[in-house]
């Protein structure tokens, strides 16, 4: 089921199969462009029409009332609520370490310079709905926004055909202290919050994963609002040596593959016998999985095993893929960590499975995909703040440096820039 590649002999074939890029087909572009245009022109009417078309329900109100949120929280399994609270506390605690402070300093000659860090005013957090509920996505998006100090936070998630939002998502919203929840999804939800409608406020940033239409809509509205990233299918790379446990690896690969047939799971190992053991574990465990068809399709079309001569080569292959998740099932994971350059999150050792990061540990699970870990980072407090430079020159400081500054502007051929300095020098 999982094709085996030998590196470096089959490097080109491996790259062709596994190197992924964010791309969208022409039909998706056409559909999303039409949705964005109609929502921008027609506001609520277009959003309600698209919700009826895609979600199968004609809403009379797009917002979830607070009573429904309270009821979902009260009726939820108490042990789940306790876990949600503990997980959220872990996520908040991690993101508190990311908080940046404004700074000022006195430069040469008494010039005052600084940078002010301020939270964005409004954020929309998109939480996927449909076949599965993702309260973890709500917690992961809410925590950095809250820690950053965003004033108004709205969540939107698709309701079902009866107009009801998954109660576990509502309970998670209560845990995160969010009461502004909308029950719309898809590109129409992205458009509504990017442009604003009669009943939906325009926001400053949209974050959170979704299907290809949500991802493309976020890409298209960037510039009207900020976005976190453009999410593609989920992916994991596992580097393993002969000390690894085959069932651990097989189930960790399944954990990615069960998301989506387009998800990718790749094992890179120095041991051919271990690769064979994982193949056997996959064959044995697959029939026991509830989503065995999705897993099988994902592994068949987007999975692989890569046999490498050394762990240094394993690191090179991983960096070529720049995966969303990277697990290190090796004797000394900390020894190879410095050799790895590109990954959204790295899980150290056989007992640090990716599931822990998805739900509980604290670092954000909203991660760069499709090779974008080469230049993008996990969702963080930094996504929800903006930076403003502060510059203060006194008359004396301008008198000292003004001629130099004006000459610099002259060198660029920008007369008005230069004269804006010289006119001030004439008053000194």
Swiss-Prot record:
Pfam families: Histidinol_dh. It is an enzyme of class 1 (oxidoreductase). Gene3D superfamilies: 1.20.5.1300, Nitrogenase molybdenum iron protein domain. SUPFAM superfamilies: ALDH-like. Its EC number is 1.1.1.23. Keywords: Amino-acid biosynthesis, Histidine biosynthesis, Metal-binding, NAD, Oxidoreductase, Zinc. One of its GO terms (biological process) is L-histidine biosynthetic process. GO terms for cellular component: cytosol. The active site is at 324 (proton acceptor), 325 (proton acceptor). Binds 1 zinc ion per subunit. Substrate binds at residues 234, 256, 259, 325, 358, 412, 417. InterPro entries: Ald_DH/histidinol_DH, Histidinol_DH_CS, Histidinol_DH_monofunct, Hstdl_DH. It catalyses: L-histidinol + 2 NAD(+) + H2O = L-histidine + 2 NADH + 3 H(+). GO terms for molecular function: histidinol dehydrogenase activity; NAD binding; zinc ion binding. Zn(2+) binds at residues 256, 259, 358, 417. Its cofactor is Zn(2+). NAD(+) binds at residues 126, 188, 211. Pathway: Amino-acid biosynthesis; L-histidine biosynthesis; L-histidine from 5-phospho-alpha-D-ribose 1-diphosphate: step 9/9. Catalyzes the sequential NAD-dependent oxidations of L-histidinol to L-histidinaldehyde and then to L-histidine. Belongs to the histidinol dehydrogenase family. NCBIfam families: hisD. HAMAP family: HisD. This is Histidinol dehydrogenase.
